[in-house]
């Protein structure tokens, strides 16, 4: 599995997108071979993926939005490693 650094900028892989699916009553990742249902945590993280924010920016925003979580740094990095392994996400490294 890839080692995630906070300086990476996550982006949805070409052909993959997130949307709310009424019939599933949740957000999903749509991709050429099908779809994956997302839980609330995955949805909050992926809603911040815009190809501009770094993982550090996403972590900061989630820590600010959910202070009661006590820090989401490792959880967010673990999630992005899994999303990358599932081929939902690619990363741009800093120049």
From Swiss-Prot:
Q: Does the keyword Lyase apply?
A: no
Determine the domain of life of the protein's source.
Answer: Bacteria
Q: In which pathway does it act?
A: Cofactor biosynthesis; pyrroloquinoline quinone biosynthesis
Its GO biological process annotations read:
pyrroloquinoline quinone biosynthetic process
Protein task: Functions as a PqqA binding protein and presents PqqA to PqqE, in the pyrroloquinoline quinone (PQQ) biosynthetic pathway.
Question: Which family is annotated?
Answer: Belongs to the PqqD family.
Q: Which HAMAP family match?
A: PQQ_syn_PqqD
Quaternary structure, from the entry: Monomer. Interacts with PqqE.
Please give the name of this protein.
Answer: PqqA binding protein
The organism is Rahnella aquatilis
